[in-house]
């Protein structure tokens, strides 16, 4: 459960991401594909090379979903319901992959926002991404 301080930290950090959200989303995906090659199996139709338009496009989708979640932090299940359905019923993504991407997102944010990425912000973002992952996997059952 996100505390009021966590919500404040997440919103402040995401505000700092600003117009770079899509770029950071794509970078996190690239990190995931390089660090955890088995995740590539969900994207057989993508050009997964560095800077590909498909990775950039999906990175933007990831970032847009996170922006939506930040904006609806008190009602993520409702806000992310369609995305949860998509991943559970159509794409059938193994839930562990959300944890892998979350880790890569944290690394990406730490690299780009070193001054803002305090231990408290790190903990809040980690809890937030875990909450998003829980919502996205809630319809698997």
Curated annotation (Swiss-Prot):
Q: Phosphoserine-modified residues are where?
A: 3, 35, 49, 102, 124, 131, 138
What tissues harbor this protein?
A: Red blood cells.
Q: Which residues bind O2?
A: 58
Q: Cite the entry's keywords alphabetically.
A: Acetylation, Heme, Iron, Metal-binding, Oxygen transport, Phosphoprotein, Transport
Q: Which residues carry this modification: Phosphotyrosine?
A: 24
- Point out residues bearing the modification Phosphothreonine: 108, 134, 137
- Going by the entry's taxonomy, the superkingdom of the source organism is recorded as Eukaryota
Which positions does UniProt annotate for heme b binding? 87
Q: Which residues carry this modification: N6-acetyllysine?
A: 16
Report the record's disulfide bonds: none
Q: Name one GO biological process term.
A: hydrogen peroxide catabolic process
Give every Globin domain span: 1-141
| GO MF annotation list | haptoglobin binding; heme binding; iron ion binding; organic acid binding; oxygen binding; oxygen carrier activity; peroxidase activity
Question: One Pfam family name from the record?
Answer: Globin
Subunit and partners: Heterotetramer of two alpha chains and two beta chains.
What is the protein's given name? Hemoglobin subunit alpha-1/2
Please give the organism: Mandrillus sphinx
């Amino acid at each position: 459960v996100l505390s009021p301080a966590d919500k404040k930290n997440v919103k402040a950090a995401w505000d700092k991401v600003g117009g770079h959200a899509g770029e950071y989303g794509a970078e996190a995906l690239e990190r995931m594909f390089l660090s955890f090659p088995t995740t590539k199996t969900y994207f057989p139709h993508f050009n997964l090379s560095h800077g590909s338009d498909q990775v950039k496009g999906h990175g933007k989708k990831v970032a847009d979903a996170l922006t939506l979640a930040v904006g609806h932090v008190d009602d993520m299940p409702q806000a992310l319901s369609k995305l949860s359905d998509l991943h559970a019923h159509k794409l059938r993504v193994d839930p562990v992959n959300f944890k892998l991407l979350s880790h890569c997102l944290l690394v990406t944010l730490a690299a780009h926002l070193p001054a803002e990425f305090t231990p408290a912000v790190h903990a809040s973002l980690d809890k937030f991404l875990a909450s998003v992952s829980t919502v996205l996997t809630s319809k698997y059952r």
